[in-house]
């Protein structure tokens, strides 16, 4: 058990008791009511307790790509830098990159992430060791080649079955076709069928750039969402669509009608000059908007508090509307909405919810006066949380990793980077 004493929880100073992996009680919990030998007691004095953040679009091993290819367009970034480096990946490099990314996320309050990449065995190993929660998809790209398609689908199916056999409630599987401009119709149709067969979500890149939309238009005479919808890609499945930068009204209507979750990546989209997602229109249509960081190669951070602030600011600016995306809305994008997208019983601090939360010491200049803490978390907090509990287990205590040797992670990451770039 874990007992957090005297923290600010939902606006009030109170205690929180964790039993197993569930928040058992919020209120007054005297120490005398728990077994001291079996309970981790955390002093929450001067701390606010918040739900763990949920990052709905990542490529976690790409933490090793941080700063590698800055300030260039997306297609040049991919073809000239990222894809050539990815051809050198191996299990050791992916493991090191995942460890580094998981540590960064935990230390900035993220308790769950939605990932699409390769070498899933290595990703799973690192996720298991660090204690973070994850939905993991094998990234499929067939480039319209039949032989490649069969291999990709076989690999994706194998990964889903492997994750299910783990029987680890923190690690769940998904299907990850890269995008409509890199995946054939046959692969996308098979993805929907497999998602229904295995009861897993789909994670896909959509409408990130004008160029990719034009590629799909040229091939199909339809925009990407219209094209995928024409053969039932979104039917009877949960779909998380990353980016959604360039959308017309028809596509927004499809997103709403098919209950698609949008993973908004404002910083990555700005850095690659992809554009700004029409969040104002999405909100008007009651679309569930979540937040993602994308990979470190295009961000260069996994700090979701930065995404909250950017999301709250950029849409005010481009729409000349100071009330658009409030601090409360931005915070929910990064917590409750993300939890809904990944079907995680978290995202808010309530009895019966999963014990995924972070503690933040409010005795900091940028969190004072504490009466305005909801605003501070979005507009002024730097993301450096003090303690983190994931699935009822303490993973970060007083700013230091509990589950893994942090110094060793940095050593492995440096070694992996040198191997990747030699």
From Swiss-Prot:
Which GO terms are recorded in the biological process aspect for this UniProt protein? S-adenosylmethionine biosynthetic process
Does the entry annotate any disulfide bonds, and if so which pairs? none
**Residues that bind substrate:** 86, 178, 208, 294
Q: Which UniProt keywords apply?
A: Hydrolase, Metal-binding, Zinc
Q: Which Gene3D superfamilies match?
A: Metal-dependent hydrolases (3.20.20.140), Urease, subunit C, domain 1 (2.30.40.10)
Required cofactor names? Zn(2+)
Locate the residues binding Zn(2+).
57, 59, 205, 294
Cofactor: how bound: Binds 1 zinc ion per subunit.
Catalytic activity line of the entry? 5'-deoxyadenosine + H2O + H(+) = 5'-deoxyinosine + NH4(+); S-adenosyl-L-homocysteine + H2O + H(+) = S-inosyl-L-homocysteine + NH4(+); S-methyl-5'-thioadenosine + H2O + H(+) = S-methyl-5'-thioinosine + NH4(+); adenosine + H2O + H(+) = inosine + NH4(+)
Q: Please tell me what else the database record remarks about this protein.
A: SAH is a product of SAM methyltransferases and is known to be a feedback inhibitor of these enzymes. As a result of this inhibition, organisms have evolved efficient enzymes to metabolize SAH via different pathways. The pathway found in methanogens differs from the canonical pathway, it uses the deamination of S-adenosyl-L-homocysteine to form S-inosyl-L-homocysteine for the regeneration of SAM from S-adenosyl-L-homocysteine. 5'-deoxyadenosine is a radical SAM enzyme reaction product which strongly inhibits radical SAM enzymes.
**What is the protein named?**
5'-deoxyadenosine deaminase
> What organism is the protein native to?
Methanococcus vannielii (strain ATCC 35089 / DSM 1224 / JCM 13029 / OCM 148 / SB)
What taxonomic ancestry is recorded? Answer: Archaea, Methanobacteriati, Methanobacteriota, Methanomada group, Methanococci
**Gene behind this protein:** dadD
């Amino acid at each position: 058990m874990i007992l957090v004493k005297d923290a600010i929880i939902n606006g009030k100073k109170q205690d929180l008791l964790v039993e197993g992996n569930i928040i058992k009680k919020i209120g007054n919990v005297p120490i005398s009511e728990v077994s001291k030998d079996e309970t981790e007691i955390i002093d929450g004095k001067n701390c606010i307790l918040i739900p763990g953040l949920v990052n709905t679009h990542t490529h976690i091993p790409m933490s090793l790509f941080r700063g590698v290819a800055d300030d260039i367009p997306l297609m040049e970034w991919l073809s000239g830098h990222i894809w050539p480096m990815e051809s050198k990946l191996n299990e050791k490099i992916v493991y090191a990159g995942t460890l580094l990314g998981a540590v960064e996320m935990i230390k900035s309050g993220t308790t769950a992430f939605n990932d699409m990449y390769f070498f899933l065995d290595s990703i799973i190993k690192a996720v298991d060791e660090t204690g973070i929660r994850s939905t993991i998809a094998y990234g499929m790209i067939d480039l319209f080649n039949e032989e490649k398609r069969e291999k990709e689908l076989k690999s994706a199916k194998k990964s889903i079955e492997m994750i299910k056999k783990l029987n680890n409630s923190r690690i769940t599987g998904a299907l990850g076709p890269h995008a409509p401009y890199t995946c054939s119709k046959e692969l996308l149709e098979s993805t929907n069928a497999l998602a229904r067969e295995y009861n897993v979500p789909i994670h896909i890149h959509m409408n990130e750039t004008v160029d990719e939309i034009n590629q799909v238009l040229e091939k199909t005479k339809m925009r990407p969402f219209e094209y995928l919808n024409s053969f039932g890609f979104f039917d009877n499945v949960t779909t998380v669509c990353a980016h959604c930068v360039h959308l017309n009204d028809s596509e927004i209507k499809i997103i709403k009608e098919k209950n698609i979750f949008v993973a908004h990546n404002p910083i990555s989209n700005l850095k690659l000059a992809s554009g700004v997602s029409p969040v104002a229109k999405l909100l008007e249509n009651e679309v569930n908007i979540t937040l993602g960081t994308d990979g470190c190669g295009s961000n260069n951070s996994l700090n979701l508090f930065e995404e909250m602030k950017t999301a709250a600011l950029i849409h005010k600016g481009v729409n000349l509307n100071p009330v658009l995306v409030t601090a409360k809305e931005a915070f929910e994008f990064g917590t409750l909405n993300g939890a809904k997208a990944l079907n995680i019983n978290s995202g808010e601090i309530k009895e019966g919810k999963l014990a995924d939360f972070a503690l933040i010491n409010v005795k900091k200049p940028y969190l004072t006066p504490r009466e305005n803490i909801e605003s501070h978390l979005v507009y002024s907090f730097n993301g450096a949380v003090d303690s983190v509990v994931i699935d009822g287990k303490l993973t970060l205590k007083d700013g230091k990793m509990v589950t893994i040797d942090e110094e060793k992670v940095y050593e492995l990451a440096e070694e992996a980077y040198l191997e990747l770039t030699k």
